[in-house]
């Protein structure tokens, strides 16, 4: 084989390997590209299949937070800027910043009835967040 032909084969194989690696990376990461689904997006796309773990996010609707099982299980509604809502149930200790009207991202699965069962809650806050313990210090000086 001539040197030029060998170089072309080597270049072709290298290019094919790079394309294959890029395709594998794209397909592996495309599910993780969306940080969370809002109620509006889930209403448009439909609910994911039962048992598939997803993240849903939005705001905790004021007045929707209730407790059951002696306070062990909480239920609340996640809203966004659309008429769509998601009912979430969570059994565990909520983050300190979790409250009605605040942003939340919940990780979990949908039940056959369409309720979202969260295994993890993340409370979102704005960039101006300051712990309660430091607020008196700021006021004093």
Swiss-Prot record:
Topological domains annotated Cytoplasmic: 1-7
InterPro entries: CcmE, CcmE-like_sf, NA-bd_OB-fold
Family listed: Belongs to the CcmE/CycJ family.
The protein, known as: Cytochrome c-type biogenesis protein CcmE
Keywords: Cell inner membrane, Cell membrane, Cytochrome c-type biogenesis, Heme, Iron, Membrane, Metal-binding, Signal-anchor, Transmembrane, Transmembrane helix
Residues of the signal peptide: none
Native species: Hyphomonas neptunium (strain ATCC 15444)
SUPFAM superfamilies: Heme chaperone CcmE
Gene: ccmE
């Amino acid at each position: 084989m001539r040197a030029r032909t060998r170089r072309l084969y080597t270049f072709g194989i290298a290019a094919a390997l790079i394309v294959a690696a890029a395709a594998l990376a794209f397909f592996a990461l495309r599910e993780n590209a969306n940080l969370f689904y809002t109620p509006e997006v889930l209403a448009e796309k439909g609910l994911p299949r039962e048992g598939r773990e997803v993240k849903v996010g939005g705001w905790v609707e004021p007045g929707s937070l209730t407790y059951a099982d002696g306070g062990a299980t909480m239920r609340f509604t996640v809203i966004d800027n659309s008429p769509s809502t998601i009912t979430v149930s969570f059994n565990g200790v909520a983050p300190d910043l979790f409250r009605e009207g605040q942003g939340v991202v919940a990780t979990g699965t949908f039940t056959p009835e369409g309720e979202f069962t969260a295994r993890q809650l993340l409370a979102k806050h704005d960039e101006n967040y300051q712990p309660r313990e430091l607020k008196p210090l700021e006021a004093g000086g």
